[in-house]
Amino acid sequence: MEITPEQFKRIEHCLPVQRGNVRLSNLQVVNAMLYVAEHGCKWRGLPNRFGNWHTIYTRMRRWTKAGVLDKMFEELQREQLVRVKIEVVSLDSTSIKVHPDGTGAPKKNGPQAIGKSRGGWNTEIHMVAADARTAVTFCLSPGQAHDAPEGRRLLQSLGPASRPIHLLMDRAYEGNETRQLALDLGFIPVVPPVRTRIEPWEYDRVMYKRRNEVERLFRRLKGYRRIFSRFEKLDAMYLGFLSFVLVADGLRGLC
């Protein structure tokens, strides 16, 4: 599947203007990136119809370092959030296996969000989602990190809610600190208490069923091979793919 010229027009203004005699258009590069994301192939394995693989890889790397893909995600996200009229958001995480090619980042790049758990090397994606197609914000952590602290960082990055919004979370986030932060920010936490709670609380079980929306979004993202497994040594490149895949999936829903 490819991004059509009509869909590309929605994100074209986010990309650097091409000048001079350019062999590969930005649309060609974007579709090559989508091919790699969907099939999980090595950059060298790109079909010849996309052009020189190294040019494509270099351009994506440049866009990632310059924050172009983040800007693209934020622009499209604004359109999606206006369309869905947020009343409920869900906070959750999912574990990503790290391929051997994704380990061993040079130390000069600093620590990466890769950690070891019982299943081997893993990365965790933490996400706040408005529905099964719309991510609000996301981040990475090493696989062994606990969900609650990362969830609180995401909530703090959102800032105060403009109006009361239900925040659906599973038991990993039922701690007092997380629930209090949600209340302080203007959210209405909907989270079941752990069974060992001395004073358990009631929660909206019907509303809680909508938490499956963030799980469905994770399932959509994992349909892309480059998201399902982490091949990137650097967080920046993996986050770049994640932003780009959310954009590509969002374009299909909008156009």
Language model segments and positions:
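Short alpha-helical elements
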Residues: M1-C255
